[in-house]
Amino acid sequence: VRRSPWFHSTRAAFWGAIPAAVVFALSDRAPAPRAPALLAEPAPPSHRPAEPVDASAAAAPPIDASAAEPVDAGPPFERPTSLIALATWTPVRVEPRRDAQALGYLRAGATVDILDGPAGRDGCVVHRDHPEGGWYRVRGGGYVCVGGGFAVPAPYRGYRAPTQPDLDAGMPYPYGINYGQSIMYRRLPTLADLRVYEPWRFSRSTPDAGPVAAAEGLDAGTPPTSPAGTEADPSDTADNRAARRVAEVRDAGGPPRLGDLAGERGGPVVRRLLSGMYVALDRTIRSSGTDEVYWRTQSGGFVRNGRLAPVRNWSRFQGQVLDETHQLPLAWMVSETGWEYTPFANGLGASSHRRVPRLTPFVLADAPPIRSGAQTFWRTVDGRAVNQRNVRRALLRTPPEGVGPTEKWIDVDLDEQVLVAYEGARPVFATLISSGRGDRNSGVRNYESPTGSFRIQSRHITNTMDGDTAGDGPYSIEDVPWVMYFHGSYAIHGAFWHSYFGWRMSHGCINMSPPDARWLFLWADPALPAGWHGVYSGTTQPGARVELRHSRANAPEEGRPASAARAMPVAPTQ
């Protein structure tokens, strides 16, 4: 499984400007912690993120870092009070130099307050238009290179920032799911681009032709002509060769690889999208060249509106915040056909009382269970009972050795499929999760989550996850919400593509409903300063401890309800 956290990028890419009619919002929340002393920075991924793209009608292009020139000291200037990030990964470094470790990072369009500076220009390449450039210390700790390709003083005239994440919502961005094969462009495509990369759309007999079918009087089925003075076939591009390669692989009976979908570097195409791939949405833009509406994605790509369906039916399930009136043990109904029972007076059985919906919560009584043959029933505080097979239980656990009296830590029971957050010995939150599907006693398609004691290594408001999975083919989900990595590529994160929490569904990560993942993300350490998109743990600000365990010896794989397979017809889970 490959995942592509933005913080791994070694080369920043820039957001272009978009038409002035679009309004943008900036996010600035949360208190600022002290900068931690860092652990080792995570290793780079096996692939770099796709470069963002520019709108065709840019009002003010971003600064090109490659064209930046060192600036000689000039006349006195007024120190800027805030900066705006231009790159998809704008690092905040522990010291004012390029090779210093990163404390965290900003995403394009984010603004943060400047505390002081500049503290020199060691490795900070400054554009000649910014004599005030250099390393500035920002709120939250650390230094940002200002005046080059990463960030500039705010406000930046003419810059149209992408929509910033909403930290008050269950989902930080709106999302769309792709249906059929479509193309993510690096900029708004022209008619010439469509002729080359989507020639089938110029045939009136093609249902998906849209408004371009009659463009410039093209007849049905007429092939595109070569540009003047060009003898080569314009459709013989790396991007179309990639499309043919995908088709050939499918004709041979196998799924394409993720790399087969990538466009030619520097060309108009970022990549091709397959059914079930998700993108995070910024805003719509109408192309003047084709008179079509395109979604600009948070990654900077452009996807035709007609190919994307908005994601609306994500799970609103919420676990239980624990306090003096709400305590463990708790249980949730996870069966589609669950019943609540009335115990017999002699305690030797129970009779059915009423059907209850899936995800119904129960407060369990501190009483012995009811056993009837091979069945076990847990008593509830209201005098009823629930069948052990139909529910998942969250029980109080003694803190592991070494946990401080108020230290935050997370307990994940992989057999019960529940998560409980603690502060010392006090539980503060409990909910259902979905861990890796598969059986730890079998190596066949085994995506089981790891067990052991870990710590949160990094936290990201969103992070893209994609890769190739044997049997399932490639998958791609841009900007997965509320991500906290705890062991290599394993993370706790929100999942909006399924709702079967309480069942094993993932490729190894710990899935939570978006509202639950948001609650845990905002609660956990290390703290995320205002305006930052991601933060790394350190020795002075370690990440919250995460315990993953099995509560039952040799517990078999329980599978998932039959309706779970019907719930998400596309896109494998993460």
Place the predicted regions along the sequence by residue.
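Ser/Thr-rich, Pro/Gly/Ala-heavy low-complexity intrinsically disordered linkers and tails
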Residues: 32-73
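Sec-dependent N-terminal signal peptides
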Residues: 1-37
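Extracytoplasmic
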Residues: 78-80, 87-89, 107, 131-135, ...
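SH3/SH3-like (including bacterial SH3b) beta-barrel domains
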Residues: 95-110, 262-277, 345-358
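Short, structured beta-strand/loop micro-motifs enriched in basic residues and often containing a Trp
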Residues: 87-97, 254-264, 336-348
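Cell wall/extracellular polymer interaction/catalysis modules
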Residues: 353, 365-451
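Boundary regions of SH3-family modules and the immediately adjacent low-complexity/disordered segments
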Residues: 38, 68-80, 129-264, 295-337, ...
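Exported/periplasmic cell-wall-interacting domains
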Residues: 402-405, 429-432, 438-439, 444-451, ...
